[in-house]
């Protein structure tokens, strides 16, 4: 499929029949990350050029914006529905305090980023879940953003690419959270019934409630 021709694979021992990748050239002034698997310190620039995969084959987790930079053509992403935010309908103790703290630490307003972009020159709608925002859990705002994106894609006859990184339903929102699975599934079905393409990318971690 031409839509997927841009995809390339990282170089590592797991993808090359056990052969080791080239030795890491380290610069003392460059920030590094320690691989939890092989315990080596790897320069951030080396990880970035290799899709955040260590030479031993360990995959580092990525934020939504990092994945966006890998997936979308440069300067093609236009964010949608960022004004849809969490509200505390159940008055769950300390919920909004946690949300505000998470917004600061993750630099995102919610657990999903939605918009339009070009991937390999192909226009599409794109959503990426943010693991640093309450483990990418699906609350009412997340469900509403994704539903609106599929409705937008159906109206404009665009394919959708979705990156799921989620710990499941957001317990602080109770039934309002559980309702989102039915709502988003309905929007996905209408998009499919219109004969449009949807590519879900399941990444670590993705639990059954949001697949």
PLM features: what roles do these ranges have?
Residues 1-196, 205:
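Terminal-region recognition feature
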Residues 198, 210-211:
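Extended, hydrophobic alpha-helical segments in both membrane/secreted and soluble proteins
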Residues 201-208:
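Glycine-rich beta-to-alpha transition loops that act as phosphate-gripper elements at the mouths
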């Amino acid at each position: 499929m031409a839509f997927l021709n841009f995809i390339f694979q990282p170089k590592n021992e797991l993808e090359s029949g056990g052969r080791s990748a080239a030795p890491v050239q380290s610069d003392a002034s460059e920030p590094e990350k320690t691989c939890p698997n092989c315990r080596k310190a790897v320069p951030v620039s080396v990880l970035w050029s290799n899709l955040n995969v260590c030479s031993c084959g360990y995959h580092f987790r990525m934020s939504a914006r990092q994945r966006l930079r890998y997936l979308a053509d440069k300067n093609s992403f236009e964010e949608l529905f960022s004004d849809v935010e969490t509200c505390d309908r159940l008055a769950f103790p300390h919920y909004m305090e946690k949300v505000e703290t998470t917004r600061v630490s993750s630099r995102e307003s919610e657990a999903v980023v939605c918009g339009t972009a070009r991937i390999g020159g192909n226009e599409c709608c794109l959503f990426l879940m943010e693991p640093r925002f309450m483990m990418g859990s699906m609350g009412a705002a997340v469900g509403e953003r994704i539903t609106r994106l599929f409705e937008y894609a159906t109206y404009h006859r665009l394919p959708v690419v979705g990156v799921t990184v989620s710990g499941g339903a957001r317990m602080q929102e109770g039934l309002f959270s559980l309702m989102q699975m039915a709502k988003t599934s309905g929007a996905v079905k209408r998009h499919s019934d219109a004969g449009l393409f949807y590519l879900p990318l399941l990444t670590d971690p993705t639990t059954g409630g949001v697949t």
